[in-house]
Amino acid sequence: MEAEGMLPPQSLSAKFEGSFAYLTVRDRLPTILTKVVDTLHRNKDNFYKEYGEEGTEAEKRAISFLSRLRNELQTDKPVLALTDNAEDTQAWNEYMERQQDLMENGQLVSWFKSPWLYVECYMYRRIQEALYMNPPMHNFDPFKEGKTQSYFESQQAIKYLCTYLQELITNMENMTEIQLRENFLKLIQVSLWGNKCDLSISAGQDNSQKLSPIDSLPDLQRFILVDDSSMVWSTLVASQGSRSSGMKHARVDIILDNAGFELVTDLVLADFLISSGLAKQIRFHGKSIPWFVSDVTKQDFEWTIKQTMAANHKWMSASGVQWKHFMKEGTWSYHDHPFWTLPHEFCDMTVDAANLYSTLQTSDLILFKGDLNYRKLTGDRKWEHTVRFDQALRGFQPAPLCSLRTLKADVQVGLQAGHAEKLSTQDPDWMTNGKYAVVQFSSPHREQ
């Protein structure tokens, strides 16, 4: 736990004019809302065909709701309590009250004055409220089109990756531990760089992967600022016991980020972990509602496996069939606890989602994918870049964990002294352009 009396640094916020948080709230969030409105409008004929006049009226009401929301955001209006009586409504409204208690000089919680992490998460929850409040549309995913497009536009890279995976599986029994480690490290890096494909950062523009992911790795190595991959490997090897005896049933939890190509890289890594015996069980954690434009929902997860099974490519199809089998037999499982779509820092989990924390404590390794998970791990705060990753977690230590993240927000810890300054000179946007990455590991058993 963090030292008693030590206050964490300030939250990143749009109140710091000119900051990345400010530019995101001012420019990118309204753009995303506009795209959601456009998506609803383009689907109005489908709503009418499926639900008749009720669908048409629901679409109009949702668009009106979202247009008001965009105005509230752009004019820095106070944040409003949710009114949709969903499973998480009370948790959201209680969190708003907590934020209000932190405001100074009688100010109200608002878009440009409150923590960026909170208001950005809140925007996506309000989009969901617009759908919840108009029942025929409550299951509509306004981001589905972009996610499926990302998958299809990355077909060539997916073919390369599935072919590579199937070759590995064919030769698995003859692999030495050195070869196994080498291929594990490659697939960790593929999963890491798969995170570059983030539609919320590009505000929904094409951000697909078209090159061979494996061939790209040597050129990308120098952009990894912290690489704790070897510690991840050591943790897995220690947790599974002897490879031949298979005495321990190691479980890996993967906290997913983006659908499309990135999800495929995660599935390939998970397949390798099972097929190699490095893990006996994989638990995937996704989002229960459409989230941050490209995040994985249960529908995206199932759709991706189904599409890969149906591919007109031998090794893609073989991979999809195997993944379906893993799900059916329970080797893989998908979970979407509501905490993942709350605005909380992960250090709040012990109190605000104790059941989820208890579940994660039984894991042998937790992989946190992507930028938003990193922001929640570190509290999205103005940490010094040299602060240890363990310290920035502020006591969140359910099990050995690793963040696989390409940098898309101006929070980064665990760097050597002088490294951030050197990067700022070479590339002023190094924290936000998705060009750099980290593989950062922390364990409750690790010596500090």
UniProtKB/Swiss-Prot annotation:
Which reaction does this chain catalyze?
Answer: beta-D-fructose 1-phosphate + H2O = D-fructose + phosphate; beta-D-fructose 6-phosphate = dihydroxyacetone + D-glyceraldehyde 3-phosphate; L-glutamyl-[protein] + S-adenosyl-L-methionine = [protein]-L-glutamate 5-O-methyl ester + S-adenosyl-L-homocysteine
InterPro entries named in the record: ARMT-1-like_metal-bd_sf, ARMT1, ARMT1-like_metal-bd
Record-level Gene Ontology MF annotations: fructose 6-phosphate aldolase activity; fructose-1-phosphatase activity; metal ion binding; phosphatase activity; protein carboxyl O-methyltransferase activity; protein-glutamate O-methyltransferase activity; S-adenosylmethionine-dependent methyltransferase activity
Q: Which GO terms describe its biological process?
A: DNA damage response; methylation
Record keywords: Hydrolase, Manganese, Metal-binding, Methyltransferase, Nickel, S-adenosyl-L-methionine, Transferase
Q: Which residues are involved in binding S-adenosyl-L-methionine?
A: E262, D295
Sequence motif: Subfamily III RTxK motif, positions? 405-408
Which residues does Mn(2+) bind? D257, N258, D295
Instruction: Write down the Gene3D superfamilies for this protein, in alphabetical order.
Output: 1.20.930.60, Uncharacterised protein PF01937, DUF89, domain 3 (3.40.50.10880)
Reproduce the UniProt comment on modification after translation: Automethylated.
EC number of the protein: 3.1.3.-, 2.1.1.-
Binding residues for substrate: D257, N258, D371, L372, N373, Y374, R375, K408
Q: Which cofactor does it need?
A: Mn(2+); Ni(2+)
Q: What is known of its domains?
A: Subfamily III proteins have a conserved RTxK motif about 40-50 residues from the C-terminus; the threonine may be replaced by serine or cysteine.
* Role: Metal-dependent phosphatase that shows phosphatase activity against several substrates, including fructose-1-phosphate and fructose-6-phosphate. Its preference for fructose-1-phosphate, a strong glycating agent that causes DNA damage rather than a canonical yeast metabolite, suggests a damage-control function in hexose phosphate metabolism. Has also been shown to have O-methyltransferase activity that methylates glutamate residues of target proteins to form gamma-glutamyl methyl ester residues. Possibly methylates PCNA, suggesting it is involved in the DNA damage response.
| PANTHER family linked to this entry | DAMAGE-CONTROL PHOSPHATASE ARMT1
Q: Which family does it belong to?
A: Belongs to the damage-control phosphatase family. Sugar phosphate phosphatase III subfamily.
Any idea what this protein is called? Damage-control phosphatase ARMT1
Species whose genome carries this gene: Danio rerio (Zebrafish)
